[in-house]
Swiss-Prot record:
Keyword Membrane: yes
Statement: the UniProt record of this protein carries the keyword Phosphoprotein: no
Location (main, coarse): membrane
Signal peptide: 1-21
Protein known as: Probable non-functional T cell receptor beta variable 7-1
GO biological process, one term: adaptive immune response
Keywords: Adaptive immunity, Cell membrane, Immunity, Immunoglobulin domain, Membrane, Receptor, Signal, T cell receptor
Organism of provenance: Homo sapiens
Pfam family, one: V-set
A single cellular component GO annotation: T cell receptor complex
Length: 115
């Protein structure tokens, strides 16, 4: 893959109820050159207060790095804080940002929300 970094953003919804509501994601996948900045965005179903970012590296199990209850985050990722950040506005859109991407950032990134 050379100097390209492939980050997939996918949606995984938690919960058994079907509300007929929609989910919005900014990109189905994102390809970035090594060293570039990347932002993944997730717009959860209205009324979902809890939001979870997951990461799955090639050949690894699912990791649970970041959790939001409302706009307050609990970061258990161990990801370098100087290069990674997650934000969520007033119970709404969440953005996961990567600065100066590296080969080790290659993974599937998923976001889920629940009420």
């Amino acid at each position: 893959m050379g100097t390209r970094l492939l980050c997939w953003a996918a949606i995984c919804l938690l919960g058994a109820d079907h509300t007929g509501a929609g989910v919005s994601q900014s990109l189905r996948h994102k390809v970035a050159k090594k060293g570039k900045d990347v932002a993944l965005r997730y717009d959860p179903i209205s009324g979902h207060n809890a939001l979870y970012w997951y990461r799955q590296s090639l050949g690894q199990g699912l990791e649970f790095p970041i959790y939001f209850q409302g706009k307050d985050a609990a970061d258990k990722s161990g990801l370098p804080r100087d290069r990674f950040s997650a934000q969520r506005s007033e119970g709404s859109i969440s953005t996961l940002k990567f600065q100066r991407t590296q080969q080790g950032d290659l993974a599937v990134y998923l976001c889920a929300s629940s009420s």
